[in-house]
């Protein structure tokens, strides 16, 4: 199983950047950020893309919980860079806005490996189905 998972920049609804058609990466790097801890795959991907352009983001909060970061963005505490599956409900409800940053797109991959010739229990089949959603 190999499912692409986009990662996106998000801002609180009503943030000045939320209405912009595009946000340049250098403008974004000047904002207050809430990010996941270093070592998480999508955080590392962001840091690498920023470094390649001579930029960096110095978050004022780093947490291990992407869900909690999304809630903090909803409450207007800053911007973040999170997997789309985490922010989708808040985006749909209009509580946060996805920022269009064309010079920094990141897609991670949700992967699950299993032996194709081995018998799969009903629980394993259900788990594979869940990962594919």
Predicted regions and their residues:
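Short beta-strand->loop
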Residues: 1-8, 93-106
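Flexible hinge/capping segments at coil-to-helix
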Residues: 1-33, 122
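Residues embedded in well-ordered beta-strands
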Residues: 8-10, 16, 79, 97, ...
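Short secondary-structure boundary segments
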Residues: 13, 84-86, 103, 110
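Secondary-structure junction motif
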Residues: 17-18, 32-53, 120-124, 128-129
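A late-sequence structural motif
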Residues: 19, 99-133
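Hydrophobic hinge/microswitch elements
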Residues: 39-99
């Amino acid at each position: 199983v190999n499912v692409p998972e986009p990662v996106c920049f998000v801002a609180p609804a009503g943030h000045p950047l939320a209405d912009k058609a595009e946000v340049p990466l250098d403008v974004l790097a000047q904002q207050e950020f809430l990010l996941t801890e270093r070592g998480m795959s999508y955080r590392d991907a962001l840091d690498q893309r920023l470094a390649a352009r001579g930029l960096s983001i110095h978050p004022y909060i780093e947490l291990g919980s992407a869900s909690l970061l999304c809630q903090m963005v909803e409450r207007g505490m800053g911007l973040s860079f999170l997997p789309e599956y985490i922010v989708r409900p808040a985006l749909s409800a209009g509580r946060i806005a996805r920022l269009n940053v064309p010079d920094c797109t990141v897609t991670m991959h949700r992967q699950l490996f299993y032996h194709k010739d081995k018998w799969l229990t009903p629980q394993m089949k259900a788990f594979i189905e869940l990962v594919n959603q």
